[in-house]
């Protein structure tokens, strides 16, 4: 579990730093696209794998919108490693027992903060969002 926490801390440093430094550059069009991706994250009628892939797509697009290719690549790499951890927690569990959308409940607040051009608030909500990963068990 320590390695998972370290990866989440790494993601927070990368994603939070990108949002803090470049979040105000994200356009309304990009936020609209992120909202569409988030709709997929909020579905409870999908498999855990489908849910994870939607969440991964949201975070990758969020960081891509910040416009730093190196951070973008590092987040993708880290998300790849976290896919294995997520699989251990969720895959094979009956989707009727899960409320997968709960671990994406902060996405809307992140996007709202970005619309307000409030990068600090977006980072605060990102921290809460990443914290939900460790609550999966």
Task: List PLM regions with ranges.
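Amphipathic alpha-helical packing segments from all-alpha helical-bundle domains
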Residues: 49-53, 73, 98-101
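Hydrophobic, amphipathic alpha-helical faces that serve as interaction scaffolds
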Residues: 9-25, 57-96
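Amphipathic alpha-helical dimerization/coiled-coil segments
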Residues: 14-42
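Conserved positions within tetratricopeptide repeat
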Residues: 31-35, 52, 72, 123
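C-terminal all-alpha effector/ligand-binding and dimerization domain
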Residues: 36, 42-43, 57, 87-137
């Amino acid at each position: 579990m320590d390695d998972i926490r370290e990866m989440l801390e790494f993601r927070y440093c990368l994603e939070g730093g990108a949002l803090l430094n470049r979040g105000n550059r994200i356009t309304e069009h990009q936020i609209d696209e992120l909202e569409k991706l988030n709709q997929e994250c909020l579905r409870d009628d999908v498999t855990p794998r489908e849910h994870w892939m939607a969440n991964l797509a949201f975070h990758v697009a969020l960081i891509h919108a910040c416009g730093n290719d190196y951070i973008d690549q590092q987040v993708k790499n880290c998300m790849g490693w976290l896919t294995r951890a997520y699989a251990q927690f969720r895959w094979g569990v009956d989707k009727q027992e899960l409320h997968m959308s709960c671990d994406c409940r902060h996405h809307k607040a992140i996007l709202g903060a970005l619309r307000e051009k409030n990068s600090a608030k977006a980072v605060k909500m990102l921290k809460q969002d990443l914290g939900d990963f460790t609550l999966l068990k």
